[in-house]
């Protein structure tokens, strides 16, 4: 433990005084100071000038990261008949209807993304209290309530990331693995920031993006210059 403590302290010292750096500098710093033996996720946290308690200030969207997330995404699909077959063929991990609803109600949630055909929403709607807090509730605004099940499953499996402003106006997500090339991480980060920028709600007042920070799963964070990250 002492050795890990020294590594963590060394990482914090390396980050000291580094603020509002470029995305490239932040990625290089994070990669050079990893102190654990597993492949950490590179995470982004964006503080936005919105209050998501107001409907006209909610920030929600989806972005396909150009280089994927490096994460294996487990996908569940609520569908029947031909659409259920389509979901299975597209690579969905779990496909069902009432049986899947009962599984979720029992507390067994073994998926990271949930997709549904429109006709299944009366069933899925009963699961709002379970799926909602986990940000798993299918929503047409992010393409997870759809008849094009094949495309939705492939997008989820291929590196598509959903985002939503949480309490305090913070949006956070994983944007790749530390093992990715620096250029690929930088590309993913700018794609994510660009998508959040385009999702600016009509009710947002004043500065929309207040702070952007990058970190690894176990490492300290570093703030990134907003104008450098938000390049159209």
UniProtKB/Swiss-Prot annotation:
Q: Which Pfam families match?
A: Ribosomal_L1 (PF00687)
Q: Which UniProt keywords apply?
A: Repressor, Ribonucleoprotein, Ribosomal protein, RNA-binding, rRNA-binding, Translation regulation, tRNA-binding
Q: Which GO terms describe its molecular function?
A: rRNA binding; structural constituent of ribosome; tRNA binding
**What's in the GO CC field?**
cytosolic large ribosomal subunit
CDD domains named among the record's database cross-references: Ribosomal_L1
Q: Spell out the SUPFAM superfamilies in the cross-references.
A: Ribosomal protein L1
The UniProt entry, under InterPro entries, shows: Ribosom_uL1_bac-type (IPR005878), Ribosomal_uL1 (IPR002143), Ribosomal_uL1-like (IPR023674), Ribosomal_uL1/biogenesis (IPR028364), Ribosomal_uL1_3-a/b-sand (IPR016095), Ribosomal_uL1_CS (IPR023673)
Q: Example GO biological process term?
A: translation
Q: Which family does it belong to?
A: Belongs to the universal ribosomal protein uL1 family.
User: What HAMAP family does this protein map onto?
Assistant: Ribosomal_uL1_B
What do we know about how this protein assembles, alone or with others? Part of the 50S ribosomal subunit.
Name assigned to this protein:
Large ribosomal subunit protein uL1
């Amino acid at each position: 433990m002492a050795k890990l403590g020294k590594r963590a302290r060394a990482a914090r010292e390396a980050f000291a005084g580094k603020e509002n750096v470029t995305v490239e500098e932040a990625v290089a710093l994070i990669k050079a100071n990893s102190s654990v033996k597993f492949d950490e996720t590179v995470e982004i946290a964006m503080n936005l000038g919105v209050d998501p308690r107001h409907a006209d200030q909610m920030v929600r969207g989806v972005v396909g990261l150009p280089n994927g997330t490096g994460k294996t995404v487990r996908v569940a699909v609520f569908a029947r008949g031909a659409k259920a077959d389509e979901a299975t063929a597209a690579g969905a991990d779990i496909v069902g209807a009432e049986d899947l609803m009962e599984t979720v109600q029992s507390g067994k949630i073994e998926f990271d993304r949930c997709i549904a055909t429109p006709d299944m929403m009366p069933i899925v709607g009963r699961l709002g209290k379970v799926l909602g807090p986990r940000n798993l509730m299918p929503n047409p605004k992010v393409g997870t309530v759809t008849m094009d099940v094949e495309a939705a499953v492939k997008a989820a499996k291929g590196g598509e990331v959903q985002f939503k402003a949480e309490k305090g106006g913070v949006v956070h997500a994983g944007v790749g693995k530390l093992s990715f090339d620096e250029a690929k991480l930088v590309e993913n980060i700018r794609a994510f920031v660009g998508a959040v920028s385009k999702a600016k709600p009509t009710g947002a007042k004043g500065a929309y993006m207040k702070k952007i920070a990058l970190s690894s799963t176990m490492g300290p964070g570093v703030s990134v210059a907003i104008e450098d990250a938000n390049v159209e």
